[in-house]
Curated annotation (Swiss-Prot):
Catalyzes the retro-aldol cleavage of 4-hydroxy-2-oxopentanoate to pyruvate and acetaldehyde. Is involved in the meta-cleavage pathway for the degradation of aromatic compounds. Residues 6-258 form the Pyruvate carboxyltransferase domain. GO terms for biological process: 3-phenylpropionate catabolic process; L-leucine biosynthetic process. This is 4-hydroxy-2-oxovalerate aldolase. The keyword Lyase applies. It comes from the Bacteria. Interacts with MhpF. One of its GO terms (molecular function) is manganese ion binding.
Amino acid sequence: MNGKKLYISDVTLRDGMHAIRHRYSLENVRQIAKALDDARVDSIEVAHGDGLQGSSFNYGFGAHSDLEWIEAAADVVKHAKIATLLLPGIGTIHDLKNAWQAGARVVRVATHCTEADVSAQHIQYARELGMDTVGFLMMSHMTTPENLAKQAKLMEGYGATCIYVVDSGGAMNMSDIRDRFRALKAVLKPETQTGMHAHHNLSLGVANSIAAVEEGCDRIDASLAGMGAGAGNAPLEVFIAAVDKLGWQHGADLYALMDAADDLVRPLQDRPVRVDRETLALGYAGVYSSFLRHCETAAARYGLSAVDILVELGKRRMVGGQEDMIVDVALDLRNNK
């Protein structure tokens, strides 16, 4: 660690959207953002779970627009930066400009781990706006460390000043994480930061985040009570407690985070965010974590097991954006019964 302070990036108000079908009220957003700000996290990501303009038939409609959520958070935050997520093809540079005007100062431009080339315009425009611009390589387990590093290098070339390893499926272990960070560090400029976004489907979210920091990672994503897709993200309060015991600098108030997790976030969960049969299947099969709620809906509709649908999606190597295929897979399984 060399005494450097970790950058703590909270994702409760973006990835956490998946856990409650994108239904945060504006008051929920204000309360959670204020609690996070008071606890001194560095950034607070706010958007539909699938990023700017994710509200749709395919991904699920949000209770509010991205801009309403961003403005609600920006109104109460005094210290942290407001971040947002953009997936090229869903969000546009027009949406990015609107998010900037609403108060977002950090953007994570997210692509599948082999498709960094679709992010060039969005990264370049974010830099022109003066945003803290991050490249976000989703489903990082689906390519080799060497290929991931090549994609990271592309994003760096477009202007991203931080590149994330993103374990969207919660499918990686500590060795997988170490290999990917070593590969990135070997090709990126020394001044380019790296970040880790974990999911907890194999209960390794905190361990993988610690392994990333040991390999020189600068920024860590986490969420209150793990609020996120699948079994959730690395639980923020657990990660802070663990690294505090290691003597690492994080700048956050552990007890304030513990209170916010239990008092503000956990009561909102209509489906517990935890490792269970379905979320473990996500991690084991290497499936995009936000498929969980969609699969459970399809399973109920067609009289199937959500686990069977998830495992089949994993076999077919489905990735984020292919939510429409969940029903196709369910119908295939039903017809083959």
